[in-house]
From Swiss-Prot:
It is found in: Cell membrane. This is Uptake hydrogenase large subunit. It is a peripheral membrane protein. Heterodimer of a large and a small subunit. The keyword Acyltransferase does not apply. Belongs to the [NiFe]/[NiFeSe] hydrogenase large subunit family. InterPro entries: Ni-dep_hyd_lsu, Ni-dep_hyd_lsu_Ni_BS, NiFe-Hase_large, NiFe/NiFeSe_hydrgnase_LSU. One of its GO terms (molecular function) is hydrogenase (acceptor) activity. It comes from the Bacteria. Binds 1 nickel ion per subunit. PANTHER family: HYDROGENASE-2 LARGE CHAIN, UPTAKE HYDROGENASE LARGE SUBUNIT. The gene is hupB. It comes from Rhizobium leguminosarum bv. viciae. PROSITE patterns: NI_HGENASE_L_1, NI_HGENASE_L_2.
């Protein structure tokens, strides 16, 4: 059956059905089903979240000052960003302000997360969708060295270094214990890199394992631990004592100097490894511009990284805010989190129930009541689904919409909005990438563009960290050591009933928490996370979400090896892990693969 969606996609589910399940992430597990035509081109895509989060239910009647500690556990990869969003929601509801030092420290922690998440995502979750590890065994180490030195002056680029990496890789392969490289689609026709580029990428994959351990030390310095650092309504929980005396764990100059050193390291890694690798890989995939989906149509960002404490206006935010509709870069619409006409969640195709499912609810009025049922055209059972019925309920993810539109969120959305706003810090790097690769601006709206935007954002975040670190040190030297305001800490100072919203730009996209507080306790709590936007099912009018849209019209080299599906889905950074099964239309396993 062929369907034309309101947001401009033609769906045809009459072809062969391919099921990828489970594709897992921290918020839950993900399943993808596609229909391909006789030429193995994807003509229909169905994305579903197969696990109920339920944090909103857990939080009801709890102390709002503790909400951050619960919501932070939603995700163990983008650790801390839910906590920051939560404390901002409570502060917004109760009118609590934070000191300047707390604003700088929060920005440092959030930006450190951006860099950490982007680096780990690309090298350890996404790179192997572009890089053929086995091909690296046939590379010439001297030619690999020449390639590496032609794109960067990174010191680990000698022929001997790459020879050692190749030898280690060969022993690894010959041992039969492939670990993260097991069951890859090595040799698939969709791999385009020469052996030398593959060897260089494998070397940097290994280097990034060590590098990511250093970045998280910033969270342990300011937040006490990682993952899940500590946060505080009204500021940050770390006192400042530059003379080294006082509370255990207080921030002193030794620890501040360590943060400065880590920032210098991550800037160098971004400049000399991550961004050059993206450019090198991109140069071989210039003709693989699939996966754009909604990115060239509808994108959305809340904005984040406030310059000034307690100022979340668009002018204060370093990351851009706004919405673009129908691909019109000439107009960026303002975004208001509190406007019930702007943001609504639908459950027509989600395993929840509303009193009237033809209408969406603003998160302040949101309902999280599970209602698990399979549609009449589904195959299998509730505990063993063989094929979903996308005409009915088919996902544990709700369908958020901005003024009725399905939207893409994430680094690409942020950079498209910054580009459209003609902000030099976003537009100039994008223009340079496009010019160096010889690509038009429309190439930005693709899987490759989404991957490049994440690298550019990691680079941008490193320099912003240096800025806020210098700002923090200057403020401390000026005599300001405040890190928290606690004048409204006690519940007896709060209104009887109040509501608020907190927002951030998580590494994977716009994130917001809406809270209602009544009699000092949480009366209602709703989270709308990046994957809710990108992984949303269809809405009452038939609009498809960003994941589903991105897979449309993508050709597959081999349907039993869904490399192209994973390449595009991974580009959104849905924290994939565990194993994936590919099923034939009759439910029989065709192949088993390990997603890395």
């Amino acid at each position: 059956m062929t369907i034309q969606t309101p947001n401009g996609f033609t769906l045809d589910n009459s072809g062969k059905r391919i099921v990828v399940d489970p594709v897992t992430r921290i918020e839950g597990h993900m399943r993808v089903e596609v229909n391909v035509d006789e030429n193995n081109i994807i003509r229909n895509a169905v994305s579903t979240g197969t696990m109920w989060r339920g944090i909103e239910v857990i939080l009801k009647n709890r102390d709002p000052r503790d909400a951050w500690a619960f919501t932070e556990r939603i995700c163990g990869v983008c650790t801390g960003t839910h906590a920051l969003t939560s404390v901002r929601a409570v502060e917004n509801a109760l009118g609590i302000t934070i000191p300047d030092n707390a604003n700088s420290i929060r920005n440092l922690m959030q930006l450190a997360l951006q860099v950490h998440d982007h680096v780990v995502h690309f090298y350890h979750l996404h790179a192997l969708d572009w890089v053929d590890v086995v091909s690296a065994l046939s590379a010439d180490p001297k030619a690999t060295s020449a390639l590496a030195q032609s794109i960067s002056d990174w010191p680990l680029s000698s022929p001997g270094y790459f020879k050692d990496i190749q030898t280690r890789l060969k022993k690894f392969v010959e041992s039969g214990q492939l670990g993260p490289f097991k069951n890859g689609y090595w040799g698939n026709a969709s791999y385009k890199l020469p052996p030398e580029a593959n060897l260089m990428a494998v070397a940097h994959y290994l280097e990034a394992l060590d590098f990511q351990k250093e970045i998280v030390k910033i969270h342990t310095i300011f937040g006490g631990k990682n993952p899940h650092p500590n946060w505080l309504v009204g500021g940050v929980p770390c006192p400042i004592n530059v003379d080294g005396t006082g509370a255990v764990g207080a921030i002193n100059m030794e620890r501040l100097n360590m943060v400065t050193s880590i920032i210098d390291q991550l800037i160098e890694f971004n400049d000399k490894v991550y961004v050059p690798d993206i450019m090198a890989i991109g140069s071989f995939y210039k003709d693989w511009l699939y996966g754009g989906g909604l990115s060239g149509k509808n994108v959305l960002a809340y904005g984040d990284v406030p310059e000034h404490a307690n100022d979340y206006s668009e002018a204060s935010l370093k990351l851009p805010r706004g919405a673009i509709i129908n691909g019109n870069l000439a107009e960026v619409f303002p975004v208001d989190h509190a406007d019930p006409e702007q943001i609504q969640e639908f459950v027509t195709h989600s395993w929840y129930k509303y009193p009237d499912e033809s209408k969406g609810l603003h998160p302040w009025d949101g309902i999280t009541e599970p209602h698990y049922e399979l549609g009449p055209n589904a195959k299998g059972t509730k505990t063993n689904i063989e094929q979903l019925d996308e005409g009915a309920k088919y996902s544990w993810i709700k369908a958020p919409r901005w003024r009725g539109n399905a939207m893409e969120v994430g680094p690409l959305a942020r950079w498209v909005i910054g580009y459209a706003q003609n902000k030099a810090e976003f537009k100039d790097p994008v223009d340079k990438v496009l010019k160096d690769l010889g690509l038009p601006v429309t190439a930005l709206f693709s899987t490759l563009g989404r991957t490049a935007a994440r690298a550019l954002e990691s680079q941008w975040a490193g320099y912003q960290m240096r800025y806020f670190q210098n700002k923090l040190i200057a403020n401390i030297k000026a005599g300001d050591s405040n890190t928290a305001f606690v004048d409204k800490w006690k519940p007896e100072t709060w209104p009887k009933e109040v509501k608020g919203v907190g927002f951030t730009e998580a590494p994977r996209g716009r994130l917001a928490h809406w809270i209602r507080i009544k009699d000092g306790k949480i009366d209602n709590y709703q989270c709308v996370v990046p994957t809710t936007w990108n992984g949303s099912p269809r809405d009452p009018t038939g609009n498809i979400g960003a994941f589903e849209a991105s897979l449309m019209d993508t050709p597959m080299s081999n349907p039993t090896q869904p490399l192209e599906i994973l390449r595009t889905i991974h580009s959104f950074d849905p924290c994939l892990a565990c194993s994936t099964h590919v099923m034939s239309p009759d439910g029989q396993e065709m192949a088993r693969v390990q997603v890395r």
